[in-house]
Amino acid sequence: MNVEEANKIVIRPYITEKTFALVENEQKICFLVNRESSKPRIIEAIKILYNENAIQIETARTVYGKKAFVKFDSADKARDLATKIGML
């Protein structure tokens, strides 16, 4: 997978008050992703785009699209990535 394919999978971070709290409390960041994307492909895209390893992923389909809740192994990594992508 290259960067172009990864950008088609991970559309953008999903920022709300609830997802903002997830960064601090559960080391998770929420992304809107392509509806047809699988969990392994989402993890691979996160690694390519942001150079971070995800340890767990949960997905949910909503009227806004498919959301991926990506958990990182430490609060520092989640917080640093959130700052890097403009959430904090």
Predicted regions and their residues:
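Contiguous, often N-terminal, cationic amphipathic patches that form binding interfaces
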Residues: M1-L88
